[in-house]
């Protein structure tokens, strides 16, 4: 079966690169382009006063200074709000997001983004991957870019929409995200960070000794090869 791909252009949503749509729909899905937080004049947004939608509620600052925290809060809010606008234009909302990728310039400030995400997506956020990158915008001022896959509510051919798969056997994560969701006959899983959930504090898996014996098939002994390949193979 051949599906038609339809581009979506959102009013009052600046194009990061001229001519590229904010999303495309096909086969019941909505594929959302990377949302770089921009002002209406096309420049990178850096503070709440530049938002055209309702800004995030004011909260006491964390250990970060306002200079560092304000761009992160505002840009995160902008990204989620624009994704929400795309889905609302199709009769849906953020609960229809099945998978997202969060590209971050400074992962050490992730907690600031997480506070915004909690407000926007509630207790059942979609499976996601947090990815550290060198840059997320041409001018270097954007801290975050978010893209995703969602249901296209206007053309979803199945009765069931997104449902969180609750399985206590699924490995824990380092942050609060759904491990997997189902939608119709499809399953979407989150990115998995290699952590040792059996150890206190759930530390990162770093070497062969952190995994069961059957996972040490590339190990040859205490050698330079092991010190180089160990973390990669174990993770």
Please name every model-derived segment.
Residues 1-81, 85-234:
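N-terminal presequence-like segments and the immediate start of the first folded domain
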């Amino acid at each position: 079966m051949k599906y038609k791909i339809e581009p979506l252009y959102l009013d009052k949503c600046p194009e990061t690169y001229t001519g590229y749509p904010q999303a495309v729909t096909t086969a019941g899905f909505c594929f959302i382009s990377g949302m770089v937080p921009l002002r209406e004049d096309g420049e990178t947004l850096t503070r709440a006063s530049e938002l055209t939608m309702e800004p995030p509620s004011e909260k006491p600052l964390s250990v970060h200074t306002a200079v560092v925290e304000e761009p992160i809060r505002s840009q995160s809010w902008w990204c989620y709000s624009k994704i929400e606008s795309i889905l609302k234009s199709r009769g849906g909302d953020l609960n229809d997001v099945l998978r997202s990728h969060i590209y971050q310039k400074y992962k050490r400030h992730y907690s600031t983004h997480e506070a915004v995400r909690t407000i926007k997506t509630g207790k059942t956020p979609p499976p996601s991957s947090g990815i550290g990158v060198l840059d997320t915008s041409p001018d270097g001022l954007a801290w975050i870019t978010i893209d995703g896959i969602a249901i296209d509510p206007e053309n979803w051919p199945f009765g069931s929409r997104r449902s969180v798969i609750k399985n206590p056997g699924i490995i824990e994560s380092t942050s609060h995200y759904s491990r997997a969701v189902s939608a119709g006959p499809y399953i979407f899983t989150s990115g998995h960070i290699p952590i040792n959930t059996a150890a206190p504090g759930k530390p990162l898996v770093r070497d062969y000794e952190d995994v069961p014996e059957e996972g040490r098939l590339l190990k040859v002994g205490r050698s330079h090869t092991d010190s180089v390949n160990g973390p990669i193979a174990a993770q």
